[in-house]
Amino acid sequence: MLNRIVAFIFLIILSPIFLIVALFIFIEDGFPVFFKQKRVGINYTFFQIYKFRSMKKNTPNVATHLLTNPKQYLLKIGGIIRKLSLDELPNLINIISGEMVFVGPRPALYNQDDLMALRVLAGVDRLKPGITGWAQINGRDEISIEEKVKYEKEYLQKKSFLFDIQIIIGTFTSVLMSKGVKH
C-alpha cells in the first residue's frame, strides 16, 4: 500500500516532467507518447507495462538488444529519455495499479523464457517486479541474465526496507552517471 501512495504522490509532483517528455515525443513522432508492452509479473502472471515511447512507431516489438540496428529506431529525444531513465516514469501507473513496486526485479518481456526459467529456479518469480532493483544498479544492460538472476536472488534473501532505500539511492547515482545503459 505504501508503494501505491508514494507512487501517486510522485505522479502528481512529476506531472510537469510527464507533460514535457510527452510533448517532445509528440512533436517528434506524434501519438501515442506512451508505449505499452506485455511483461511478466509476480508468479509468472502477465500485465501491460507503461513507458514513454523512446523508439519510432514502426519498431519491432522485441527487446532492444535483439534489434539488428537499434539506433535506427531511436527517436532523437529517445536517447536522452533512456539515458535519464525518463522512459520508466509511467511505471508509476503500474505501481498505483498494484502490478509493480519501486524495488524488485525488472519485469521480463513475455518472450524472455530463458530469463523467466532462471527466475523460477531461483524463486525470484515470487517477487513483484520493480522500477529498479539490485541487478539494475549492478550492471543493468551490461550483465548476463545469469548475473541478473544472481543479483535478484541476493535481493530476495536480503529484502528489507533499508536495503530498498540503499537500492533507490544507488539508482539515482546510476542514472546520473548513465551507468549500465547500452541503448
Model-assigned labels for residue ranges:
Residues M1-K57, N94, F161, Q166-H183:
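A hydrophobic, helix-centered structural microdomain
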Residues L2, I49, P70-I77, L89, ...:
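Alpha-helical membrane-protein architecture signal
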Residues L11, H65-T68, D125:
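Residue-level "hotspot" positions that anchor or transmit function at local structural transition points
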